[in-house]
Amino acid sequence: MVAAKTIKSLVDKADLPDNIKEELYNKLIEYNKKYKFKKAEVEAIIEETVKEYQNSLVEPGEAIGTVAAQSIGEPSTQMTLNTFHYAGVAEINVTLGLPRIIEIVDARKNPSTPIMTVYLDEKHRYDREKALEVARRIEGTTLENLAREMSIDILNFEFIVEIDPERLEKSGLDMEKIQKKLESSFKSAEFEVDGYTLIMRPKKVTKLSDLRRLSEKVKKHRLKGLSGVGKTIIRKEGDEYVIYTEGSNFKQILKVPGVDPTRTRTNNIHEIAEVLGIEAARNAIIEEIVNTMRDQGLEVDVRHIMLVADMMTLDGVILPIGRHGIVGEKASVLARAAFEITTQHLFEAAERGETDPLNGVVENVLIGQPVPVGTGIVKLAMNLPLRPKRE
C-alpha cells in the first residue's frame, strides 16, 4: 500500500489543472485503502489520467464558436415556446424553454417572470409557522391585495375600501397600521377606519378625475414587504421549507432576518452581477441555461454554455449576444456589416476611415480568402534544398 504522502507528491508533479489534481488525489486515497496499490500502479493511473486529459483538450484551430452554436442551437429547436407554471406551484408563472434561453443570451435587464428562491436559516427552515413569518416580511402587500370591494362615492367625494378580514389576518397587518401608513404617505387626504372599512377623503380635490387618480395611487401603495416582490409561496423540499417569490429584489432579500443569504438566489442575472459581482453572474448564466435545457429533457455539454457565458461577461459587464453587444463590438467592419444593418455599418466605418485586419472567419469568407480556422491557421513556407553542384 502506497503512503498518502507519496500519492500527494506524484499527483502534484502531474501536468493537470488543480481541480482535477484534487479529485484524482481523493479518488486514489479512497481506492488505495480498498485495493492497496503499488507505486507503479499509482504512477500508471496518473499517467493514464494525464493522457485522457490531453486527449480531451480542444485541437488548435478548432472552430469552437461554431461548434458551441450548433450544440446549443440544435437541441433548442425541440424546446417549448410557452410560459409554464413553476413545477408543482400553480400560482407562480415562470418562463421556460426557448423564450428563457433568448432572454438570457439577450441579457435583458428585467426577465419576464422574475423569481427568487429563498432559503431560510437554521432557526426558520424546519417550522412552517416560522417560515410563514419570513414570507410575511418579504411579500409585497398593497391595499388592493387586501380589499374585498373598492368603490368611489361621487356624492360625498370619498374612496371606500372594504377589507377582507381573512386576507388582513394572513398579511399580519391590522386596520390601525394601514391607516397610519396611508396617513404618513398621503398628506393630501384624510383616512377614517370603521370596522373593516377604510374611507379616504381628499383635502383639496374638487374634480372627480383627481379623486380617481388619487384612489389609484392609494390602492397600489405598498403597505409592507419588499419593493418588486409580489406574492410568496412556501414549499417543503426534503426536511426544510423554501419560499418562492413572484418578483425579485435580490439586494434587499439578503438583509431580511431569517433568510440564508449563502443559498438564496434569483433568476435576474443583472441583479446577481450588481450584488455579488460578474463571476457570480457568469455562474448564474451557465446554471440558468443548463437547468432550462435539462427541464426540457435536453443534455448539452456544459463547456459550450461556459463559452457563451465567458463571452457575455468578458468585459466585466453582461453583454448580450447580438448587434447591441458582442457582435456589435467586433473589430472587423465586414463582420459587423455581415450580421445586421449592413449599410449603416459600412457608412460609419468609411466616415471614420476604419481598416479591417481580416483576422476573423466571416470577413475572410466575404473576400474569398482562406479562413483562419483548422488548417487555415497554419502558415508554412517550404525551404527547398539547394541543388547539388554538378561535378
Swiss-Prot record:
User: What range does the record give for the signal peptide?
Assistant: none
- Point out the coiled-coil segments of this chain: none
Annotated Gene Ontology cellular component terms: cytoplasm; DNA-directed RNA polymerase complex
Q: Where in the cell is it found?
A: Cytoplasm
User: What domain of life does the native source organism fall in?
Assistant: Archaea
Q: Which GO terms describe its molecular function?
A: DNA binding; DNA-directed RNA polymerase activity
Per the UniProt entry, the Enzyme Commission number(s) are 2.7.7.6
Q: Name one GO biological process term.
A: DNA-templated transcription
Catalyses which reaction(s): RNA(n) + a ribonucleoside 5'-triphosphate = RNA(n+1) + diphosphate
Q: What UniProt keywords apply to this chain's record, in alphabetical order? A: Cytoplasm, DNA-binding, DNA-directed RNA polymerase, Nucleotidyltransferase, Transcription, Transferase
Q: Which Pfam families match?
A: RNA_pol_Rpb1_5 (PF04998)
Alphabetized NCBIfam families for the sequence: RNA_pol_rpoA2
Report quaternary structure and partners: Part of the RNA polymerase complex.
Give the protein family.
Belongs to the RNA polymerase beta' chain family.
Its job: DNA-dependent RNA polymerase (RNAP) catalyzes the transcription of DNA into RNA using the four ribonucleoside triphosphates as substrates. Forms part of the jaw domain.
Q: What is this protein called?
A: DNA-directed RNA polymerase subunit Rpo1C
Organism of origin is Thermococcus onnurineus (strain NA1)
The gene coding this protein? rpo1C
